């Protein structure tokens, strides 16, 4: 039990650390996304510097990383706490990938995948919240921040287990922390909208 749990946590980190956005930038444009735009390897920076198609593929792959880490833990019949730790390991791998000098993405897509795997109605509700905000504002970071803030509330009101509620708070804080510079620009009114160049 302990060994299988530890192996799943390690696998979760390795899954999360797969640098999909970085590889898209290198292979398709010959650029290092860590040196472009926001410096993030996530789908939004791919959208701004590589293109819509690659950004969609990166988004789906990043969602898959988070979902797979959780679903593997579930498939082995491990308890809720191991499941959420596997998901957090994937988030940590995405944010701090060992292959890229610990500089990765902002955990939004991978976090979405994680919660689709843990409690898909909550994951879909967060996605709906994200889409509603982005349709009104056309600001990805604002949509991410609102969805992150809403996540623990949605998990709590859905009757999620104590492990699920706890990890929703932790994941929300991780996403907000990764968006701290975006929040500063949002407050200053300088955050770019979709289609505009700039940091995000």
Swiss-Prot record:
The keyword Transferase applies. It catalyses: an acyl phosphate + sn-glycerol 3-phosphate = a 1-acyl-sn-glycero-3-phosphate + phosphate. Pathway: Lipid metabolism; phospholipid metabolism. One of its GO terms (molecular function) is acyl-phosphate glycerol-3-phosphate acyltransferase activity. This is Glycerol-3-phosphate acyltransferase. Its main location: membrane. NCBIfam families: glycerol-3-phosphate 1-O-acyltransferase PlsY. Coiled coil: none annotated. Its EC number is 2.3.1.275. The chain crosses the membrane at residues 1-21, 53-73, 81-101, 114-134, 139-159. The gene is plsY. It comes from the Bacteria. It is a multi-pass membrane protein. Catalyzes the transfer of an acyl group from acyl-phosphate (acyl-PO(4)) to glycerol-3-phosphate (G3P) to form lysophosphatidic acid (LPA). This enzyme utilizes acyl-phosphate as fatty acyl donor, but not acyl-CoA or acyl-ACP. Keywords: Cell inner membrane, Cell membrane, Lipid biosynthesis, Lipid metabolism, Membrane, Phospholipid biosynthesis, Phospholipid metabolism, Transferase, Transmembrane, Transmembrane helix. GO terms for cellular component: plasma membrane. It is found in: Cell inner membrane. Belongs to the PlsY family.
